[in-house]
Amino acid sequence: MKNIKGFKVAVALYTVLVTASCSTSPKGDGTLTFVESNENALTVCHFDQVKNTININLSELVEDLKIIRFENTDNAFFKSCNLCITDHYIGIRQSESLPFLLFDHNGKLKCQVGAIGNGPGEYSQTIYDEAINEKTGEIYLSFFFSLPKVLVYNTDGKFVREIVTKEKLSKPKVEVDDNGDITIIHMPFTYNKEKFLATVYNKNGLFKQELKPTPNFLQENFNQDIFAYHNVPEFSFWLSSCDTLFHYDKNANKIYPKFKMDFGKMSETPLHIYNELPGYYLTAMLWDKGIIAVNKEKQTSNYARLINDFFGHMEAPMFNFSNGWFYQMFEPGRLITQIEKRLTDSDCSAEDRKQLETMLESIDEEGNNILFMGKLKQKGK
């Protein structure tokens, strides 16, 4: 989709959702404009206006840094596809043929969640999203395609129940409230009998509500993707066919467009992905073309590099925020390589050097993975 069309779709959809909207003049550093109403504001970042690059310290975004060394028992070794971190747990999504694993913050394997197979509580499809809710003591797994359900387990890995939906789910994203309500957003297809963009079930699996899709959300094939990183209180998501980041308001049963990158009249829109943090909108330009960080409060936009000032001032991945946590997973050999590279930098201070060398000496190259993680600060903290 050409971006100018995507921009028109976003603005057109917004004018349907709200009334008395108006486009404001640029604010902040001039890279942003806003489409505003009494109940919402759509932030538009103009790609051709973003020129500068800044460093952001990790300590500005997270409360502290934890370094987790996962245990070296045979059952605990893994290759991570994705992870879900909470205050006490680390959930590891593996490949299609391997089960979900649950660790504690000491890196100890607590359990395997369910099992691979086709029996009750088993799964053979790729996990597409997961949620761990410590209030309910449950783990929720959703799957890539064609299953009309979300599987629920306890934190001992035992199957508890399934949430059965009205329609087969396609690339579903899930969030669970403290009261156990589960919200599901997925890609609706034109051929679905029961078309919904979002749906909510209570903790017992009883249907509560759904939001029907407008035509621009309906899909003909699997060429698009849906993303949700679960870093803010609202259900923040974006569907690549619309190229706008939305919030789903469960209480109002509405969606609101919140952020859009305007690429102007470029003949080909650069491949990109959106993420949202409490204080930033992030746009990852794929193929190592940088991360654009929009500061919500200052109303500024810059290319951004993330610096891990907790650990040797090593550069860290700016986009690695999910479920309210920063994460950076290393195989031991890769961490050794990055530390050695940092030690050759001319700006590596004596203090940083000591910290890095101490860590380097402690790494078992044949050991399990090592995780750097930190909980996101919430807005105003």
Regions found by a protein language model. Give the residues of each.
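Blade-loop segments of beta-propeller domains
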Residues: 71-80, 99, 103, 108-136
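Conserved blade-ending motifs and adjacent loop-strand segments that build the rim/top face
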Residues: 256-274, 298-323, 336
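Repeated scaffold domains used in trafficking and secretory/extracellular systems
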Residues: 78-82, 124-130, 168-177, 218-227, ...
